[in-house]
From Swiss-Prot:
Subunit organization: Monomer.
Protein name: Shikimate kinase
Disulfide bonds: none
Swiss-Prot/TrEMBL keywords: Amino-acid biosynthesis, Aromatic amino acid biosynthesis, ATP-binding, Cytoplasm, Kinase, Magnesium, Metal-binding, Nucleotide-binding, Transferase
UniProt superkingdom: Bacteria
UniProt binding sites for Mg(2+): 19
Obligatory cofactor(s): Mg(2+)
Length: 170
């Protein structure tokens, strides 16, 4: 693994725990925490589902790249990326060269349990959210693994934080 340079970038599907774990890691490291989805919505002045409605996924992805470019240059950060941030090669290259990238992995069934009551996820507003999560998982899991410096199972938050802290100190 490359040396930890003070930038921790979390990738993974929606519901993997990137935001929850990211906040915990930032607190433990005494770093600033950023959630790219939150930053996109704040910059746009509207929630993400509205961006998807008005601009489609492509418009959202363009905004995502712009926000990643702004955040990635900041020192001592923990950055939680959106689940689809790695879909663009430009984003993958940017995050790979900028920090330590961790794939928070969880199976689709766990992801569904964690996102079941969250109506702010446009990609899950379908008749069969589990089938959609399985489809996203099949398509994205290999990309996450390729992009990440290492993969961590995101089961118990406290244990995952400890695992990450150990990995970063190597």
């Amino acid at each position: 693994m490359k040396n930890f340079n003070g930038k921790l970038i979390l990738i993974g599907l929606m519901g993997a725990g990137k935001t929850t774990l990211g906040r915990q890691m930032a607190q433990r490291l005494d770093y600033r925490f950023y959630d790219s989805d939150h930053e996109i919505a704040a910059a746009a002045g509207v929630p993400i589902p509205t961006i998807f409605e008005m601009e489609g996924e492509q418009g959202f992805r363009s905004r995502e790249t712009a926000i990643l470019k702004k955040l990635i240059v900041l020192p001592h950060i923990v950055l939680s990326t959106g689940g689809g941030a790695v879909l663009k090669e430009e984003n993958r290259a940017l995050i790979r060269k900028s920090g330590t990238v961790v794939y928070l992995h969880a199976p689709p069934e766990t992801l569904l349990e964690r996102t079941r009551c969250d109506n702010s996820r446009p990609l899950l507003q379908v008749a069969d959210p589990l089938a959609k999560l399985r489809e996203l998982y099949a398509a994205r899991d290999p990309v996450y693994r390729q992009t990440a410096d290492f993969t961590v199972e995101s089961a118990n938050c406290r244990e995952t934080v400890q695992t990450l802290l150990k990995r970063l100190s190597r």
